[in-house]
Amino acid sequence: MKKILFLTILALGIRTNTQAQTTWAEHVAPILYNSCTNCHISGGIAPFSLVGYSKAVANANGIADATQKRRMPPWPANSNYKRYAHERILSVEEIKTLQDWVAQGSKSGDISKAPADPKPNTGAVTVNPNLKLKMPNYSVNTSTDEYRCFVLPTGINVDQFITAIEVVPGNRQIVHHVLVFQDTSQIPVNKDKADPAPGYLAFGGTGSNTSQLIGIYVPGQEPYQFPTGFGARILKNSNIIIQVHYPAGIQNQLDSTKVLIKLNTGSLRPMIITPGINHNNSSLTNGPLYIPADQTKTFYSKTVLNFKLSVFAVGPHMHLVGKSIKAYNVNGKDTIPFVDIPNWDFHWQRTYILRTPTIVEK
């Protein structure tokens, strides 16, 4: 009996000693470069880079902790409720690889087997845009969050359709997010003229009721590419207005963000990009929107559509007060899920693009 026990322990020991080593070069770098270094790169909005072994090993414990708790990569949407295109979600196997790497001493491995270091994303993805619109250089000096609008003339003299839109931050370290509007009125133009600095301050929009949202940018988000045959209508004589959010504490930083747009003059099916659905007091079924001090309240909002549409993407938003949000469509006996965010975080807002457009009956 003692001999059998000894042989069993010896066999287990041999198996443990010959277990494959998880290394940065062959196993960890591909994960980080695919899922993290869009932001964690020199010149990116993240506070430190994860490009190269030395940067990764210096943050090894933080990587293991943040990914195991799914704080990183940031993806607030509940993947058990709805799946999307361009998801930033690590698989269970990838998380285990990162855990094993740290547990085994965060070894570099054969550096020659590592993927090439990613380059800072300073350029654009959109090829041959019809419009290249750039805001004037603006020096950011702010102790509080600054929301600043810039008017970008288009020169468009006939109605057309936008088929793709991309925001390229001029300074990725300071641009928190960008909202893109079109407006045919002179309100934004006059506000811009009244402010001696480039652009003008405006919180919650452009300050014009006629502005229409046509695009959103957050760090790491892909350019809008509408499905074939669809487009967002852009009106003749319109200006593009971008509202750029600069976080608090920025000093003497220059930005010159630009917008690239692809156009089509054909007959396309119109896309409607609107922040208005379930976004006001009139849609609340248990309003008004009032929360007494030291209380938590749940509000329900409902909009009845009188037309049929195809949903391409959803962009839930609650700014700083909301804690969780869920959106869905009830069609007869069917419930169509759109998005569920159990723990809302203003800093990780984004647009969620559906894998296929979803038809919603009126």
What label would you give each PLM region?
Residues 1-23:
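Bacterial Sec-dependent N-terminal signal peptides
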Residues 13-14, 63, 188, 328:
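Single-residue recognition of alpha-helix boundary sites
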Residues 15-17, 36, 173:
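A composition/secondary-structure signal for short, hydrophobic, low-basic-content segments
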Residues 21-150, 239-243:
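Aromatic- and Gly/Pro-enriched helix-to-coil junctions and flexible linker segments
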Residues 74-75, 79-84, 114-160, 166-310, ...:
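Beta-strand-centric surfaces of beta-sandwich/beta-rich domains
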